[in-house]
Design a protein with these regions (language model features):
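N-terminal Lys/Arg-rich, disordered targeting/topogenic segments
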Residues: 1-8
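Metalloprotease/metallohydrolase-associated module, dominated by Zn2+-dependent proteases
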Residues: 11-14, 106-110
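Electrostatic cytochrome c docking/interface patches
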Residues: 36-57
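The canonical Cys-X-X-Cys-His
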Residues: 57-69
Length: 110
């Protein structure tokens, strides 16, 4: 009889723990960070040496380093959406190809 009591207590603790995880997972969905999915307008773009280079950039780096991010379906689910938004914000801050401006040529110092 004691063994059945211990199994029952373990089952109750497991059910309560899973319920808390489910409740927390539901509540965090209402935190809005990471779901704006805004793509500001493209101001300028680098002069690519070939269409292949542009294609390679956008395939490998463009989602985080441009304003032309293709947001995957799972970017709407917290906490994954928070991580993706953080990575995109960080990537755009470091280098954003959609705001690329060439520097004016410097005059030679005399």
């Amino acid at each position: 009889m004691r063994k059945n009591h211990v199994s029952f207590v373990k089952a109750v603790i497991l059910i309560l723990g899973l319920s808390e995880v489910f409740l927390l997972g539901t509540v965090i969905q209402f935190i809005p960070y990471g779901r704006a999915h805004n793509n500001p307008p493209v101001i300028a773009e680098p002069k690519w040496d070939s269409p292949k280079t542009r294609e390679l950039f956008f395939r490998a780096c463009g989602d985080c380093h441009s304003n032309e991010t293709a947001w995957p379906w799972y970017s709407n689910i917290a906490p994954i959406s928070w991580l993706i938004q953080h990575d995109v914000d960080k990537g755009r801050a470091a280098f954003n190809a959609s705001k690329f401006r060439r520097r004016a040529a410097r005059k030679p110092s005399s």
